[in-house]
Amino acid sequence: MNNIQDCFLKTRKNYLQFLKKEKIFKKSNRHQIQSLKNIYIPLSFWIEKQYTKRGKTLFLGLSGGQGSGKTTVSGILKIILKIFFKREVHVSSIDDFYKTHQDRQQMSKTIHPLFKTRGVPGTHETQLLKKFFIFFKRKNFKKFKLPKFDKSTDDRFKKRYWNNIKKKPEIVILEGWCIGAKPQSNALIKKPINILEKQEDENFIWRKYVNEKLKREYKNLFAKIDHFIFIKIPNFKMVFKWRLLQEKKLKKKSHSNKKIMNYKEIKRFIMFYQRITLQMIKDLSKSASVVIFMKKNHEIKKIIFRT
């Protein structure tokens, strides 16, 4: 029996249980089974190879457009790496590092009104992200807490609800829509790409501030990541469709629906992400160590390894 087949037999049950838990299991799940064999298991073997070569904690950045399946992919990788390779894996989302609602309100008053809305570089607590890397890279590991963000209330959880990290992981996956994003030229920043930018950021103060953050703070943070895995969406239109599905899912999970977005709100919300998402499709499709190509029906088309 080869290693791929052995891994498949040992992880199949947990994989299908995870899909059911996430409510993405399909009764006619032939494609999902094929994805385990042809996508997730080979990717897990690649990660194991990178970890073995490195010999110390491996940091992976997983990015892709909103609703592309980053949380699903990272969850599946964690299952395979833990069950088959016996690796200690930690997954964090950059979303958990958003600034508090109050801090973003303050930014909207002192810098630009568009900073009321979370998401773009500049709305994350970069000091907490720095600590994230420092704590995980320590030779003498000490337990610590990582923040948690509640999207249904648009605010950070109180510290007593934060994630307790008690054991040093061998593999760390940081997932998020803008992980690995690069800044644009000033000439591009000046040209609005949607109605939001044209009407609400006429003097390009908001997008210039975001771009400056990418040039400095975020560039330094992303430099700490060993390899990038990029989920390439077919086009930006799919972001709206998939984000709508995410909000419906969030509504079912949440006890408080006051911050969950409707159709019109989502349409406006994704405009905040459009510029960087489109730039990332150009950049990371070429530079990421691994590229996962998605189809319009949310199934994986293929995977490419560059290292």
Locate the predicted segments by residue.
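Post-Walker A alpha-helix
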Residues: V73-S74, K78
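Pre-Walker A adenine-sensing motif
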Residues: I41-R54
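Conserved NTP phosphate-binding and transfer environment spanning the P-loop NTPase/kinase superfamily
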Residues: M1-K23, K27-Y40, W177-T307
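P-loop (Walker A) phosphate-binding loop of NTP-binding proteins
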Residues: G65
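Conserved nucleotide-sensing/catalytic segment adjacent to the nucleotide-binding pocket
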Residues: I24-S35, H90-S93, F97-D154
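Post-Walker A helix-loop "phosphate-sensing" segment adjacent to the P-loop in P-loop NTPases
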Residues: I79-H90
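Pre-Walker A (Motif I) flank of P-loop NTPase domains
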Residues: R54-L62
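Conserved lysine of the Walker
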Residues: K70
